[in-house]
Amino acid sequence: MKKIDFYFDFASPNAYLSHKVIQKIKKNLGVEVNYIPVLLGGIFKATNNKPPMEQFFGVKNKNEYQNLEMQRFIERHELNDFKMNPHFPVISLQIIRGAIAAEMDGYLEDYIDKVLVHMWDCLLYTSPSPRDGRE
């Protein structure tokens, strides 16, 4: 069986979108997916990088085009339940800690699915945002 390592941050809308497509790939191709939660903000900091919305802030139409591409992806894969979390960007540290516990207890994949749906579909999880100074 083929395996895929999927590194993701719950706080990223792309994680939700990719997760939904990965579920279809798993079903259709019988691929095993190893979900690996990461803190994307920590990776940005460690690599002296910035999130796209900051990095390309001054580049005319870059963020608008990125949003257009996201919308095209959503339409192509019929991911119509996706909703942009109004508190984006959110802090995902506690969620990732929960993922570690879920993995130890043997239900990581279910945990990931539920959290991503609640962050980017039902909008039941609206953690503190880095913008409001709470953690």
Residue ranges and their predicted role:
Residues 3, 32-36, 135:
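Solvent-exposed, well-ordered amphipathic alpha-helical segments
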Residues 125-135:
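Single conserved hydrophobic/aromatic residue that forms the stacking wall/gate
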Residues 2-17:
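Local sequence-structure signature of Cys/Sec-based thiol-disulfide redox active-site neighborhoods
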Residues 13, 37, 128-130:
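Proline-centered helix-kink/hinge sites
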Residues 20-119:
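Structural alpha/beta surface segment adjacent to cysteine/selenocysteine redox centers
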Residues 15, 43, 135:
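Conserved protein kinase catalytic core
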